[in-house]
C-alpha cells in the first residue's frame, strides 16, 4: 500500500482506540510527521512507517529487527482494517 494513503488514514483515525497484537488498548495523536502514543512516551516517526510497509510479510518480530519505535503499537496500527482497507 502507498505510504501517502496509509499516512492519510493514520491521521484520520487519530484519537480512536487501537490494540497491540497482544490486545493492549491505546490511542495516539499526530504531531508533525510523528505518531505520538498516548499511553507511553514513544513516538513513531513517518520513516518507521515507510520502513514497516516495505516488509514483504509483516510481524512484530520483523519490526523489532528493523529497530523501529514502538513495534507492537506500529503493528497494531498498520494491520488494522481502518488503515489497510
Predicted feature descriptions by range:
Residues 1-85:
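Intrinsically disordered, charged low-complexity linkers and terminal tails
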Amino acid at each position: 500500500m502507498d505510504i501517502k494513503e496509509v499516512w492519510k488514514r493514520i491521521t484520520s483515525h487519530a484519537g480512536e482506540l487501537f490494540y497491540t497484537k497482544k490486545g493492549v488498548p491505546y490511542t495516539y495523536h499526530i504531531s508533525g510527521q510523528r505518531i505520538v502514543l498516548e499511553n507511553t512516551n514513544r513516538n513513531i516517526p513517518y520513516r518507521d512507517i515507510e520502513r514497516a510497509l516495505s516488509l514483504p510479510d509483516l510481524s512484530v518480530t520483523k519490526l523489532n529487527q528493523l529497530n523501529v519505535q514502538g513495534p507492537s503499537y506500529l503493528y497494531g496500527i498498520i494491520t488494522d482494517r481502518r488503515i489497510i482497507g
